[in-house]
Swiss-Prot record:
Location in the cell: Cell inner membrane
Cofactor: Zn(2+)
Record carries keyword Ligase: no
Organism this protein belongs to: Sorangium cellulosum (strain So ce56)
Superkingdom, taxonomy of origin: Bacteria
Cellular component GO terms held in the UniProt record: plasma membrane
GO BP of this protein: protein catabolic process; proteolysis
Protein name: ATP-dependent zinc metalloprotease FtsH 2
Function (record text): Acts as a processive, ATP-dependent zinc metallopeptidase for both cytoplasmic and membrane proteins. Plays a role in the quality control of integral membrane proteins.
Length: 607
């Protein structure tokens, strides 16, 4: 190969040298060029950008050059052209396409051949490493934690008492697998943690490994699937191969639904083949556990309904543990765990914070404590006070306070009436949660005011009357605007959307409508053509499971429920109009009212 390149360079170099020598033979001084023209030895002349080229008259001499070149002199060109005209020698002007010497054109093919040779040699030198690069691409991306200090324990997991009890068997198995082998028992090879986002599924999995003092492999389902078919399966094989080398260990796959969705519906589109191959390999690896394999696979998802049934059969993820939202006692424990990391003022009441955060998950509570610490640091405090915690709660519920957004006097008054309409109807209906705060300070991207209600206790069931009263509260703001100002605004848009959705669910899903019987008319969430369950849709937005006549009856019943709620809200507002005016005026003045102030003003109006 090298000798071939040497010969090629010599040949091209010789051709280049001959071209240069040939070009230099016909170049003559300008005076001689003029003399040849005067003697009539030039048949025609080309005028180039930087030279004259004269073609010799044929037949003068066999040894004479066929053409002559000389440098162009623009100062004497006028005389030269006049002389050529007198002698009848034709001339033409020719523009150079590229200002390159002729010999450089020989270098262009040489450069091209050199580039091709370089690429060929580079490909030859790297051919031996391609297989190594492909192997590296198929390596898993899971993080390995082996030091006990890097892994959590059950003490770091507040709440979830039932889940920890359920998973303690896994810890015992990882610590002493021989005890189960002696009895002929087999622990579940896979455990599926199911729960809403932020409930602590990942932390709980790490705590299992920490309690058992075993290596912990942590990966996300999306890390297995790539655009190249076969890469995900290779990564699964590599992960389980390394896990087996560790002996007793725990493999955690977060967001399992990214790789474990239902297979086979609708054919293959895009990366569907790659995901299915990855899932098939995962199923194969879990089938390969023998009785002496002290390895447990834990998966976590918040979308268990879209997982492939093969993942959930016995021998794979056959134990399912639900991680639910924390109740009041668990929220207290979670807040106490996170509060240990900040300087907390003795006056901060974590019990009150737990009571105000019903429905929030552990990640939300951790964020509240962190936001409170940031707010305390911003005001230069030495400890996090209760006010900082409440401000952090409101920031999470309603958004960032925007005192820089100034409302006009009329808009501010309309917002005040609107929020007092919500607060007043909620205070007058005994089934509704008490109001904790009313404000007309803008928050978030679009909220011009807000009313916060604090649940008396954790709730899991709601009666029909409670839902109907909730509709009254939702429509109370709009009714108060209309009664007090005499007009309607766009501020009730979200209230109308929420009220319509709630009324439609009463009729379609809960059997709480009149004249429609007990049929549940809301279809289950359908699977898309890829096998993925469609996301949450408003009630009635999916395919209908009823006739056109029933659909019209549903719409009529929803309209009736909303009309009744509006009439009840109007009766409450009209019956307590002085209280509405007094509370709205006070809110307009101070911009924020606490729940105690509101209840005191409502009670004084009742007296």
């Amino acid at each position: 190969m090298r000798s071939l390149w040497i010969v090629l360079v010599l040949v091209l170099g010789s051709a280049l040298l001959l071209q240069v020598m040939a070009a230099s033979d016909d170049r003559i001084p300008y005076a001689r060029f003029r003399s040849l023209a005067e003697r009539g030895e030039l048949a025609e002349i080309e005028i180039r950008d930087d030279m004259y080229i004269g073609r010799a008259v044929s037949g003068l001499s066999a040894r004479a050059p066929q053409s002559y070149r000389t440098g162009r002199i623009e100062q004497t060109e006028k005389d030269l052209l006049a002389d050529l005209d007198r002698r009848g020698i034709p001339y033409t002007r020719v523009a150079d396409e590229l200002g390159l010497p002729p010999y450089l054109w020989l270098l262009l093919p040489l450069a091209g051949l050199a580039a091709m040779g370089h690429l060929a040699s580079r490909r030859a030198t790297t051919a031996g490493t391609i297989s190594g690069a492909a192997t590296a691409f198929g390596k898993h991306k899971a993080r390995l934690y082996e030091e006990r200090g890097a892994i959590a324990t059950f003490r770091d997991v507040a709440g979830n008492a039932e889940a920890k009890t359920e998973l303690s068997e896994i810890v015992d198995f990882l610590k002493a697998p021989e005890r189960y082998e002696k009895l002929g028992g087999r622990m579940p090879r896979g455990v599926l943690l199911v729960g809403p986002p932020g409930t602590g599924k990942t932390l709980l999995a790490r705590a299992i490994a920490g309690e058992a003092s075993v290596p912990f492999f942590s990966a996300s389902g999306s890390e297995f699937v790539e655009m190249f078919v076969g890469v995900g399966a290779a990564r699964v094989r590599d992960l389980f191969s390394q896990a087996r080398e560790k002996g007793a260990c725990l493999v955690f796959i977060d967001e399992l639904d990214a790789v474990g969705k239902v297979r086979g519906l609708g054919g293959s589109v895009g990366g569907h083949d790659e995901r299915e191959q990855t899932l098939n390999q995962l199923l194969t690896e879990m089938d390969g556990f023998d009785a002496h394999t002290a390895m447990v696979v834990i998966g976590a998802t918040n979308r268990a309904e879209i997982l492939d049934p093969a993942l959930l059969r016995p021998g794979r993820f056959d134990r399912r543990v639900h991680i639910d939202r924390p109740d009041l006692a668990e929220r207290k424990e979670i807040l106490a765990v996170h509060a240990r990391k900040v300087a907390l003022d003795p006056g901060a009441d974590l019990d009150a914070v737990a009571a105000q955060t019903a429905g929030l998950v552990g990640a939300d509570l951790a964020n509240i404590v962190n936001e409170a610490a940031l707010l305390a640091a911003r005001r230069g405090a030495e400890a996090v006070g209760h006010g900082d915690l409440e401000a952090a709660i409101e920031r999470g519920l309603a958004g960032l306070e925007r005192r820089g957004r100034r409302l006009g006097a009329r808009e501010k008054l309309v917002v005040a009436y609107h929020e007092v309409g919500h607060a007043l109807t909620a205070s007058l209906l005994p089934t509704q949660d008490p109001v904790r705060k009313v404000s007309i300070v803008p928050r978030g991207p679009g909220a011009l005011g807000y009313t916060i209600q604090q649940p008396r206790e954790d709730r899991y069931l709601w009666s029909r009357q409670e839902i109907l009263d909730r509709l009254v509260v939702l429509l109370g703001g709009r009714v108060a605007e209309e009664e007090a100002v005499g007009d309607l605004s766009t501020g009730a848009q979200d209230d109308l959307l929420n009220a319509t959705e709630l009324a439609r669910r009463m009729v379609r899903e809960l059997g709480m409508g009149q004249g429609l019987g007990l049929s549940a008319l809301e279809p289950r969430r359908p699977l898309s053509f890829l096998g993925e369950a469609q996301g949450a849709m408003p009630s009635g937005a999916g395919p209908r499971e009823c006739s056109d006549a029933t659909a019209r009856a549903i719409d009529a019943e929803v309209a009736r429920i909303l009309a009744d709620a509006e009439a009840r809200a109007r009766a409450l507002i009209q019956g307590h109009r002085p209280t509405l005016e007094r509370v709205a005026a006070r809110l307009y003045e101070v911009e924020t009212l606490s729940g105690d102030e509101l209840r005191e003003m409502v009670a004084s109006g009742e007296a």
